[in-house]
UniProtKB/Swiss-Prot annotation:
Gene that specifies this protein: panD
Protein name per its UniProtKB record: Aspartate 1-decarboxylase
Pathway stated in the Swiss-Prot or TrEMBL entry: Cofactor biosynthesis; (R)-pantothenate biosynthesis; beta-alanine from L-aspartate: step 1/1
Organism listed in the record: Pectobacterium atrosepticum (strain SCRI 1043 / ATCC BAA-672) (Erwinia carotovora subsp. atroseptica)
Pyruvic acid (Ser) found at: S25
Pfam families: Asp_decarbox (PF02261)
Cofactor(s) required, per the database record: pyruvate
Length: 126
């Protein structure tokens, strides 16, 4: 059996640019990509915390240290500057591998400052 698992997550990054006329994609600060293990041109899913939109695109490298999150092309209709996003990448693996897999999760402040990194998401309390 093959399972699709969370590989990397950027939690609550802020959109710094939205460019409808750029050639698709989402530009992400290279430091952020490294923190979540996201590669350039990798497929990503984006969840907009502010408006509920969910969409797919691919990552491109933004200038390292710039804190850029630029939603480009048609995806720019799904997010505005200032919106909070969750950006995820996924990986497929065997059931056996999935049972010991840990994602790379990076948590951000309101101004795209990396606050902490984790290898798991906390259990949600009832």
């Amino acid at each position: 059996m093959i399972r699709t698992m969370l590989q990397g997550k950027l939690h609550r990054v802020k959109v710094t640019q939205a460019d409808l006329h750029y050639e698709g994609s989402c530009a992400i600060d290279q430091d952020f990509m490294d923190a979540a293990g996201i590669l350039e041109y990798e497929a990503i899913d984006i969840y907009n915390v502010d408006n509920g939109q969910r969409f797919s695109t691919y990552a491109i490298a933004g200038e390292r240290g710039s804190r850029i999150i630029s939603v480009n092309g048609a995806a720019a209709r799904c997010a505005c500057v200032g919106d909070k996003l969750i950006i995820c990448s996924y990986v497929q693996m065997s059931d056996e591998q999935a049972r010991s897999h840990s994602p790379k999760v990076a948590y951000f402040s309101g101004e795209n400052e990396l606050q902490r990194q984790a290898k798991a998401i906390p259990v949600q309390v009832a």
